[in-house]
């Protein structure tokens, strides 16, 4: 079953689904800066555009262009900055 999610006044939208028993979402992040909290560990893969990421506890922003991934621990969070719309795949680990 597909589940639509909308965050930050519609600036981040995703569709959730299950694949091989694991939850995943695919989505689009519009231009802006947003903070996400995590319950479970996640792997984010940028599939279009580029995102700058800063994980909780860090002062450093790291750029992730299309085709690259990063992981975030559960019960934590991260900031995302997009200078143009970008697409992503989120896998819950």
From Swiss-Prot:
UniProt-listed InterPro entries: Ppnp, RmlC-like_jellyroll, RmlC_Cupin_sf
Keyword Transferase on entry: yes
Keyword Protein biosynthesis appears in the UniProt entry: no
EC nos: 2.4.2.1, 2.4.2.2
GO cellular component: cytosol
Top-level taxonomic group: Bacteria
Any single Pfam family the record assigns to this protein: Ppnp
Keywords: Glycosyltransferase, Transferase
Reactions this protein catalyses: a purine D-ribonucleoside + phosphate = a purine nucleobase + alpha-D-ribose 1-phosphate; adenosine + phosphate = alpha-D-ribose 1-phosphate + adenine; cytidine + phosphate = cytosine + alpha-D-ribose 1-phosphate; guanosine + phosphate = alpha-D-ribose 1-phosphate + guanine
GO MF terms, alphabetically ordered: guanosine phosphorylase activity; purine-nucleoside phosphorylase activity; thymidine phosphorylase activity; uridine phosphorylase activity
Family recorded in the similarity comment: Belongs to the nucleoside phosphorylase PpnP family.
HAMAP family reported for this sequence: Nucleos_phosphorylase_PpnP
Function: Catalyzes the phosphorolysis of diverse nucleosides, yielding D-ribose 1-phosphate and the respective free bases. Can use uridine, adenosine, guanosine, cytidine, thymidine, inosine and xanthosine as substrates. Also catalyzes the reverse reactions.
Name of the molecule in the record: Pyrimidine/purine nucleoside phosphorylase
């Amino acid at each position: 079953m597909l589940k639509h999610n909308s965050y930050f006044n519609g600036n981040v939208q995703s569709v959730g689904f299950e694949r091989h028993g694991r939850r995943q979402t695919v989505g689009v992040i519009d231009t802006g800066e947003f903070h996400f909290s995590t319950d479970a560990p996640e792997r984010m893969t940028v599939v279009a555009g580029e995102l700058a990421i800063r994980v909780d506890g860090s002062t450093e922003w790291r750029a992730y262009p299309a085709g690259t991934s990063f992981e975030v621990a559960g019960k934590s969070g991260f900031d995302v900055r997009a200078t143009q719309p970008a697409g992503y795949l989120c896998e819950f680990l």
